[in-house]
């Protein structure tokens, strides 16, 4: 839990960042390349593997349970490539958003 002193420090730092007060112009120039290269080192293969893993979890949740075999059309519709937002509900129901 944050104490009052921590909250004040965070508030003053965020206010300084938003207003630009206290920042030297050369600091942004020096830190810019480092800030922009944070995600450059992540290989594209690991990103695609993470996406496929997230799509595999709902697929196993929806298609491999044997409780509601009559809802396979709904489950297959949720796993379709154009429907990106899908998740496993606690009651094993097909939940997808377009």
UniProtKB/Swiss-Prot annotation:
Coiled coil: none
Keyword Disulfide bond: yes
A biological process term (GO) from this entry: response to bacterium
A Pfam cross-reference name: Defensin_2
Factors inducing expression: By bacterial infection.
Cystine connections: 61-88, 74-94, 78-96
Keywords of the record: Antibiotic, Antimicrobial, Defensin, Disulfide bond, Immunity, Innate immunity, Signal
Similarity comment text for this entry: Belongs to the invertebrate defensin family. Type 1 subfamily.
Protein name, per record: Defensin
């Amino acid at each position: 839990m944050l104490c009052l002193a921590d909250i004040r420090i965070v508030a003053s730092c965020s206010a300084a960042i938003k207003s630009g007060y206290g920042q030297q112009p050369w600091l942004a120039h020096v830190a810019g390349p480092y800030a922009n290269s944070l995600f450059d080192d992540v290989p594209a293969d690991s990103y695609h593997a993470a996406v496929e893993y997230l799509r595999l979890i709902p697929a196993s949740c929806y298609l491999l349970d044997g409780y509601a075999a009559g809802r396979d059309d709904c489950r297959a519709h949720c796993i379709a490539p154009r429907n990106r937002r899908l998740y496993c509900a606690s009651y094993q129901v097909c939940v997808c958003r377009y």
